[in-house]
Amino acid sequence: MRYGFTSLLALGLVAAAPAGAQAAGVTVSYNLDVGPLTVTEVKFTVSVAGGQAHGKARIRSAGMSRVFSEFGATAVGEARLGEASPEPVIYTITRDESDMRKVTTVRWDGGPPSYDPPLKKSDRKERLDAAIANGVVDPFTAVLRMGMAGDSPCPSTHQVFDGREVFELALFDKGAGKLDGDAAWKGAVQKCEVRWTPVAGRAKDKGVPGDSYDVAFAPVAELDDGRKLWLPVEMSGKLKGLGFRGFVTKVSD
């Protein structure tokens, strides 16, 4: 679950330019704090042009967490934009932990996505293939669909596939609010509860229970066609019993 959650957070916890700006390109840095420690740092770049959206997130362990596990990852996503919901094209994640590197790629070209490398366990692969046949998107496209849903990203439901796990993200409306803390985004937000539920893959097979998180979305940018782009600017909840908070620390064009 660690990477599944972190990759989604990395591709989603993005504050772009001030509201009303055109979403051409932006780089964002943020921290994920668990308890009193910053355990993960992320640098994220997103660009929107010519009917295509591209996102890249670099994730690495930070602070005392590096003593126990040297973890880093790069996630890259591409999606097609149009009048309907964004459609996934390709999603690649490269994970580095200690002296091991793993690369997983998912491609969409009509019908269910293909993924490489394949799963080794035949029974798990069978269940995973059945789940992705019902229609899934990658984490980057899921965030875009939340962000381009209209007047608010919630309520909505998304089936997400990162190449190894299929999980459901269900968003529920918790009303309007305002941020004025230490995050880079300050101002009005839409509060949502996000429920994460494993559908197929290792987490599902091992009986990992679902989780829920509080997320603050803001209309941080405006697309060329005038649509607002709602993106998460803060998240909080619990991971394995420890409280966490994700927040933007720096925004640059």
Predicted segments with their positions:
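Positively charged n-region of N-terminal signal peptides that target proteins for export
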Residues: 1-4
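Residue-level detector of alpha-helical transmembrane segments in integral membrane proteins
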Residues: 10-11, 132, 225
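Active-site/ligand-binding surface loops and adjacent short beta/alpha elements
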Residues: 109-171
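Acidic, serine/threonine-rich low-complexity disordered tracts
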Residues: 22-110, 150-253
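Bacterial N-terminal signal peptides
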Residues: 6-16
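A generic signature of intrinsically disordered, low-complexity regions enriched in glycine/proline
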Residues: 7, 133, 142, 215-218
